[in-house]
């Protein structure tokens, strides 16, 4: 088929094809109605961005409801992989506490921050960890995720970011509540 004169050309072609596959599999959004993913709205038209949803709908995640920002330090890719730095940081939040202020926990150069602009509502550690899980599902390292149920004077978010060498943990005032793991019916 094609003849290549050197390894560099083969590598370039491989990287080009690999990049196209990654773009198709991850970056191109799909419709939320998976039965009509490949059907255009009208004959000859393309699917518009208003009807697109991210790949994470297939995983039970809808980014249109709670938009995430996957930006952070340029060193964030170092937090991905086997060391699970960011999940270890946000799992330091205590599920059985109610958080009333700014908090930050760290692990292996990753900081997990809960912050509000305005008044701090009483938010359980379980709710905070759930928001971090959704952020980590999409961004896999650094990013910011805003809560959806805050009042009009408050905007709260969770944030994962690279923090070395300035990693500090800040524990806010908390109160306890009776947390129980949900009962599973399986």
Swiss-Prot record:
Sequence intervals crossing the membrane: 10-30
UniProt cross-references to InterPro entries, sorted A to Z: Mug117
GO CC list: cytoplasm; endoplasmic reticulum; endoplasmic reticulum membrane
Pfam families documented for this protein: MU117
Record's keyword annotation contains Endoplasmic reticulum: yes
Its biological purpose: Required for correct meiotic chromosome segregation. Appears to also have role in sporulation.
Name this polypeptide is given: Meiotically up-regulated gene 117 protein
Organism: Schizosaccharomyces pombe (strain 972 / ATCC 24843)
Name of encoding gene: mug117
């Amino acid at each position: 088929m094609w003849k290549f004169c050197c390894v560099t050309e083969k590598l370039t072609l491989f990287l080009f094809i690999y990049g196209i596959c990654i773009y198709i599999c991850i970056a191109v959004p799909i419709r939320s109605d998976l039965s009509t993913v490949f059907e255009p709205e009208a004959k000859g038209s393309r699917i518009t961005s208003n009807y697109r949803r991210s790949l994470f709908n297939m995983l039970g995640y809808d980014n249109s409801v709670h938009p995430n920002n996957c930006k952070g330090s340029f060193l964030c890719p170092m937090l991905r992989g086997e060391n699970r730095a960011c999940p270890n940081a946000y799992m330091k939040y205590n599920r059985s506490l109610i958080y009333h202020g700014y908090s930050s926990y760290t692990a292996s150069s990753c900081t997990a921050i809960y912050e509000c602009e305005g008044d701090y509502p009483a938010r359980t550690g379980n709710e905070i960890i759930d928001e971090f899980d959704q952020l980590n599902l999409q961004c896999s390292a650094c990013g910011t995720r805003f809560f959806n149920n805050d009042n009009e004077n408050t905007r709260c978010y969770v944030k994962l970011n690279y923090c070395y060498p300035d990693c500090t943990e800040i524990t806010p005032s908390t109160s306890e509540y009776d947390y129980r793991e949900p009962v599973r019916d399986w």
